[in-house]
Amino acid sequence: MAALVVSGAAEQGGRDGPGRGRAPRGRVANQIPPEILKNPQLQAAIRVLPSNYNFEIPKTIWRIQQAQAKKVALQMPEGLLLFACTIVDILERFTEAEVMVMGDVTYGACCVDDFTARALGADFLVHYGHSCLIPMDTSAQDFRVLYVFVDIRIDTTHLLDSLRLTFPPATALALVSTIQFVSTLQAAAQELKAEYRVSVPQCKPLSPGEILGCTSPRLSKEVEAVVYLGDGRFHLESVMIANPNVPAYRYDPYSKVLSREHYDHQRMQAARQEAIATARSAKSWGLILGTLGRQGSPKILEHLESRLRALGLSFVRLLLSEIFPSKLSLLPEVDVWVQVACPRLSIDWGTAFPKPLLTPYEAAVALRDISWQQPYPMDFYAGSSLGPWTVNHGQDRRPHAPGRPARGKVQEGSARPPSAVACEDCSCRDEKVAPLAP
């Protein structure tokens, strides 16, 4: 699946005026010309790539041609970089554009780097492997971003058999994953709903079943187990932190192993509360704005600044793409740091820093804007978040169409809303969710 992000002005009117020269929403994915879709040379070139990885090459070529792009930047996580040269060759062969690969580390959707792409002279950015989480700055009408989710097909038969051998019938299961496996996850949910009480929870603006390392839904009390489809534990730990009382399982689609997973909630929370307690006696604060792509939120930074000013606390601002203990040790006069980048950096690695390294939520607790929450909130990009120390706080309160759920609410059986007006043509609009079976 892919999503195209364009400037607001260009999308609303274009050269032909408002509403003209634009196809109805939901039909964009079907507009790829047959001379691209059925091009035998292109089909042969695509076969070099793994058949179970959907890089959406025809759509990418069509979008580049539509935009008349001259220089295209590709951004992808390190796990996909081995395919970058092949994709460059294909795109340069079938378009008129010059294509380059951005090699800086890309941890997630928050790292989409349109700033660097523009600085390098690109007029089109293709971001692979993540969903359209960050609305783009619409001030530049000559720059476009295409998100390619890189849907990965796996052996669902083995997954289903593993679940059936592990859980008795009628067990209430919640299924979650990363964006690459969401379509497989929802197909599996449809297969299981006749035997189990299956839910695919949604934490808007994410897709149904999608979780991030910093954002996961709170599950209903009826859920007896949560199953994560994916490799590694980073995303799984997010939903485990948000739901400490729900047994968690991980199905690795590569090793084909279903395992019971555990997390030391007591140790993590004790470490974070100790950091908060130390911060309450701090005289000098340091505010770090992450500059790795769009990771940092200026809105959150401004909120923190206003709170510190109101309390008469001194602070210094620091812009960093990567946050290391050795870097922060160069400013010994700072008593406590608050990083507006990735909450998991503090949660997972906070004890490695000599001074407290707080998340914006933890800073709010230290400043007594909110009490310590149980369970620990994983709502950094959720629309229905706790407060202005999160990215999308208040989006669920905006007016919405009658009969449609407000953004940010956890819903069953609803399709993903666009992250912004610019994402209206996102093909994930057609995703389905398996509701909780009776």
UniProtKB/Swiss-Prot annotation:
Q: Which Enzyme Commission numbers does its entry carry? A: 2.5.1.108
Cofactor binding remark: Binds 1 [4Fe-4S] cluster per subunit. The cluster is coordinated with 3 cysteines and an exchangeable S-adenosyl-L-methionine.
Name any cofactors this protein relies on: [4Fe-4S] cluster
Outcome of swapping residue 159 to P: In DEDSSH1; impairs diphthamide modification of elongation factor 2
Q: Disordered: where is this region?
A: 7-29, 391-421
Q: What is its main location?
A: nucleus
Q: Which disease is it linked to?
A: Developmental delay with short stature, dysmorphic facial features, and sparse hair 1: An autosomal recessive syndrome characterized by intellectual disability, short stature, and craniofacial and ectodermal anomalies including scaphocephaly with or without craniosynostosis, prominent forehead, sparse eyebrows and hair, hypoplastic toenails and, in some cases, dental anomalies.
Task: Return the protein name.
Answer: 2-(3-amino-3-carboxypropyl)histidine synthase subunit 1
